Amino acid sequence: MKTTAQIRQSYLDFFHSKGHQVVESSSLVPHNDPTLLFTNAGMNQFKDVFLGMDKRPYTRATTAQRCVRAGGKHNDLENVGYTARHHTFFEMLGNFSFGDYFKHDAIAYGWEFLTSPQWLGLPKEKLYVTVYETDDEAYDIWNKEVGVPADHIIRIGDNKGAPYASDNFWAMGDTGPCGPCTEIFYDHGEHIWGGLPGTPEEDGDRYIEIWNIVFMQFNRHADGTMEKLPKPSVDTGMGLERIAAVLQHVNSNYDIDIFQTLIKKVAQLTGEKDLTNKSLRVIADHIRSCAYLIADGVMPSNEGRGYVLRRIIRRAVRHGHLLGAKETFFYKLVPTLADVMEHAGEIVNQKRALIEKTLKAEEEQFARTLERGLLLLDDALSQVKDNVLSGDVAFKLYDTYGFPLDLTADVCRERNITIDEKGFEREMQAQRARAQASSNFGVDYNNVIKVDGQTEFKGYETTSLSSAKVVALFTDGKSVERVQSGENAVVILDRTPFYGESGGQIGDTGYIATDLAAFRINDTQKYGQVTGHIGQLESGSLSVGDTVSAQVDTERRLAVAANHSATHLLHAALRKVLGDHVAQKGSLVSESALRFDFIQPEAISKEQIIEIEAIVNRQIRENISVTTEVMDIEAAKQKGAMALFGEKYGDLVRVVGMTGFSIELCGGTHVKRTGDIGLFKVVSESAIAAGIRRIEAVTAENAINWLNNQQNILNQSADLLKSDTASLVEKIQQLQDKAKKAEKELQQLKEKAAMQAGSDLAKSAVKINDISVIVQQLDGIETKSLRVMVDDLKNQLGSGVIVFASVVEDKVNLIVGVTADLTGKVKAGELVNLMAQQVGGKGGGRPDMAMAGGSQPENVGAALSACSDWLESNL
């Protein structure tokens, strides 16, 4: 029996033997494709090739593509664990032809791989195929050339309510490449319910689609007409987990080797004995998507891809809770996953430390609110009417306890309860409206500037040009032929020394001029293939066709270059100190400072910051040569050049190196030697999102100015404390010691006063059914003193209930004390929470002592009344 890893390798080997280039799986984060949340099909990385916008050095390719379907249009999350074949993560085996072979070879290859004893050796009688109703060519190839009998070939027409809307007709969109497809199904046997494609029972599990072969042969126009493509192409997909189930003689994907290994590990970690428990399936599936998403640079957050990852992690943690997991367990599955995925697990092994740290931190964070959220949900579900949970409760769970809607839906599903999703969405929209700040945006020239040709960038060699031609002018969002003095405009030149903002580096400033005109450039931006010089005409007039000189603000450019080169040194130093998991997530390089965002799941210590600074400054002092070289991207990767995550690179790339220390793909401007940076100083380090840290730093003169400013602060502080700077720490320590001593003495006085007040309050106790009760408002008394008073009164009363409320600086403090003999009747935690609800707060504690806080002092009277009423009714 073939393992899943062996099937994956067999597929790639087969198509390599047929002249296909084996291409590595692309990232789960699509490159520059805003239409996709995650890579969800093998063809995603070849989309531009199919559209004719990109060319590859090969016309045949094969891949084992990792895919995620959770969130967005393709969202399988809610079904995962409850069906045999839904997953958040799966591998798609694919072979592709870019204007090379077509239907005959695509069908022949598929049949050979599936049925040949040399490869998979499936029984031919177990296979059925579908073709598009009018695709006689594909039908004849299957029937007459391959030899599939007619009763095993099914024609599928337009079954989705519109022309060409069919399970067997594929389209990239409303317009563009499209064509019929043929699908191959496997018959699991008559002991399993289900019917053939096209029958009412087709959704059963007997006949399972294992391969889809798409024939891209038409270009659909906006009017619906179909034009034949000059070079038709082929896109295929076969789910690895599905074909593994077939070859391993199981009906459910969760019974294949990969999942069974993971399921057994989950059971071991959680103590679950029943290996058919659906929660085991959920967790085994979710560790795959979570680990690979983190490996591909996604970190848990509250928006976009990061929020989908957070939802998956929290769903897995909740199912672990159902299984009885008492401690963090999810991250412990990573080594097992890396092993069982074999070659496809290499990226998980490389990023293992980052994945484990991220998952553990996220699980610990969610565990703090999971229990309370589940109690709230359980209480709400016990009061549900008509089997519908209200949208506002679902939203409160989301907003307060971090419960994604699908996690709440999971719990409801187990009790046959649905959620009022419209009500949830109303609450969500109301929150968005409250949070939305008013914005006033200018003209978006990205949608305005359409210019033939491109701007040639000369800024690597020079910061000035004596001659450049104005090819277009834009003002107020419109193309114009001429601009006059005082007008703001965007100037497009045929060539320029000005760097357009990209890669985190801000755009250049400066001037362009003629003999009679001067245009001040305040910013430079890239608009597709052209560069826009944004600014104001200070004198004269400027027309399309004019010849101008161009001069960059050289001093500013050099300051920007110093910060950009320092960013590369910082990146390399971070990886040396923190580890290879560090990867850039964003940057800003200006003339005054640099900002660098990077993956790092833990806080960075002060000692590590000092070490990072020292490494960067050592490289600056060594005055290393900074080199730039244009080369083939594969050669750059072999040299170890780091690429910016999420960027899409062409076949030729620019490599910036700092001999023996840093090498990165980069299109920015840099110093000639590291000594030109002068000095590097970190001014701040912080977290900006879960697993993402930010360092801000200054260089050269800005670093000296920053240090001088810090020295001034030290000098002023020393003067105020009548000390010198060398003795400043000692002086502050002495003052702190004095302050602590005075604070301790003050607290002792307060406690003495509180005990005296407690003696007086004991006399005010009332009896409820022979039980002593004190309910009082004591404003201005802090929590610590209240606790002393309660303990003293419990001793004095011997048996009783003491309740105090105090308002200090508009904050409400509540405390309830119950003597040990009464905790069976009165739970301090329940009573304090009853009061806390009245003052907009929450609290907790032991049965004999509990505390709460609140933000609504005007409701303290109501809280005490509610407490008294409860005691009257329950004692």
UniProtKB/Swiss-Prot annotation:
Q: What is this protein called?
A: Alanine--tRNA ligase
Q: Which species expresses this protein natively?
A: Mannheimia succiniciproducens (strain KCTC 0769BP / MBEL55E)
Entry's Gene Ontology molecular function annotations? alanine-tRNA ligase activity; aminoacyl-tRNA deacylase activity; ATP binding; tRNA binding; zinc ion binding
Q: Which UniProt keywords apply?
A: Aminoacyl-tRNA synthetase, ATP-binding, Cytoplasm, Ligase, Metal-binding, Nucleotide-binding, Protein biosynthesis, RNA-binding, tRNA-binding, Zinc
Q: State which Enzyme Commission number(s) the record gives.
A: 6.1.1.7
Cofactor binding note of this UniProt entry: Binds 1 zinc ion per subunit.
Q: Which domain of life is it from?
A: Bacteria
Segments spanning the bilayer are none
Tell whether Nucleotide-binding is among the UniProt keywords: yes
